[in-house]
Amino acid sequence: MYYAISQARVNAAPATMLRPQRPGDVQLGASLYELVGYRQPPISSSSSSSSSTASLLPKPAREKAEAPLAEPRGPAPESGGARADAKEEQQQQQLRRKINSRERKRMQDLNLAMDALREVILPYSAAHCQGAPGRKLSKIATLLLARNYILLLGSSLQELRRALGDGAGPAAPRLLLAGLPLLAAAPGSVLLAPGAVGPPETLRPTKYLSLALDEPPCGQFSLPAGGAGSPGLCSCAVCKFPHLVPAGLGLAAVQAQFSK
């Protein structure tokens, strides 16, 4: 009798396990496993849920779910790239500061040079005298005024030489030779400095004529390595400093040319 009941339980266990269980039904297979002594090993809920979810998902979806776990390893190269970008930006800022400082210094030097040129040119500028006293000339106007002033000085020098050559007689060659070194020796004090130009009577040809007549004639000394046709050195008081006098422009040659 007992053997028949137990055999019926064993035969009915698979059917009971396969059949959906209802509330209130007793699972016969569990009591059979307890009688035999079999116990199922404990499984954590998280691992069981993840394994069951992973087993239910298809293979591509499983790979996508595992991919985000490997992403946190990427911040190290990203931080290095950000550091390199910050360093490059800092270098560009330093280079920009150097360029700006160099350009600022260049403009300051240009402004100082223009101010110095205005101090020399403006006393001789009629436009500046007619204009407002506090008005400052632009850079282009200052350069154009300086160009015209230099041309005026050159023409004045040529007129002075022509006047001295026409009315000085035999002393004209000496004045022609000595005129350029005299005016070129100190251009700042003779021609450019404000107030250095004296009254008109001090610039008359008679002053230079008397100076040329009082001084001894130009002495030409041959250079040590030169021959008969080599240039000589003029060291007279009119010339103020020694300079080369070519043989073709000696005193005798110039006098002969003007006597024709």
From Swiss-Prot:
Residues 94-153 form the bHLH domain. GO terms for cellular component: nucleus; transcription regulator complex. Induction: By SHH. It is found in: Nucleus. InterPro entries: bHLH_dom (IPR011598), bHLH_transcription_factors (IPR050359), HLH_DNA-bd_sf (IPR036638), Olig1_bHLH (IPR032657). Keywords: Developmental protein, DNA-binding, Nucleus, Transcription, Transcription regulation. The keyword Nucleus applies. GO terms for molecular function: DNA binding; DNA-binding transcription factor activity; protein dimerization activity. GO terms for biological process: neuron fate commitment; oligodendrocyte development; regulation of DNA-templated transcription. Expressed specifically in brain. Residues 42-104 are annotated as: Disordered. Promotes formation and maturation of oligodendrocytes, especially within the brain. Cooperates with OLIG2 to establish the pMN domain of the embryonic neural tube. This is Oligodendrocyte transcription factor 1. It comes from Mus musculus.
